Regions:
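Glycine-rich flavin
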Residues: 96-179
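Extended, charge-enriched "interface" segments that sit outside catalytic cores
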Residues: 1-121
Length: 179
């Protein structure tokens, strides 16, 4: 293609020193994974979670953009087991890439782990399920700790003395990256 035909096609011009313009690739994924999923929107509304649309839309925009990119990095740079420190002492530490912690912070901040327990009203489980669905599209590996955190709340509530100490941390929307 000539420079004129590239302009006519609306394609970007090659950078100085580049050999050609790349125009046959899909654009970067930037989408709202909630509002763009009509079946999900209808299901959330139909099963009583319509009151959470604004929150779901906000999280859908994150999962379809910045969290998607973080998810690629979290999967590219997998956790590393460090068995010993530089002096030879056994430490058995797992080191995570910063993208993992960023995804966890966003998931916890959105309430993926505790939305239904913090919003005890009709449709809360539906809204929480939609958050899980959105989160998994960006990065599924973090769903294990988020789901285990969600699942422990009823067990803690069964023992009020234990719940007093542990439940505030479990339901918190502040991520603590410490091991």
């Amino acid at each position: 293609m000539t420079d004129q035909s590239l302009k006519a096609a609306g394609s970007p011009q090659p950078l100085p020193g580049a050999t050609h313009a790349v125009f046959n690739q899909t654009p970067p994924l930037e989408a709202n994974l909630f509002t763009g999923d009509h079946a999900l929107v209808e299901a959330v509304d139909g099963f009583g979670g319509g009151w959470a649309f604004e929150h779901l839309s906000d999280y859908g925009a994150k999962t379809g953009g910045p969290l998607m990119a973080l998810g690629f990095d979290a999967n590219r740079y997998t956790p590393e087991l460090v068995t010993h420190d530089r002096y030879g002492n056994r430490i058995d530490e797992v080191r995570f890439h910063p993208s993992y912690h960023a995804i966890m912070a966003e998931g916890i901040g959105a309430g993926v782990h505790a939305f239904a327990w913090n919003e005890r009203r009709p449709g809360a489980m539906v809204a929480r399920s939609a958050l899980v669905y959105l989160h998994c599209q960006a990065e599924a590996g973090t769903m294990c700790p988020l789901t285990m955190t969600f699942a422990v709340a009823p067990a803690l509530e069964a023992e009020p003395a234990v719940a007093r100490n542990w439940l505030p941390g479990v339901l918190s929307r502040d991520y603590d990256p410490r091991p």
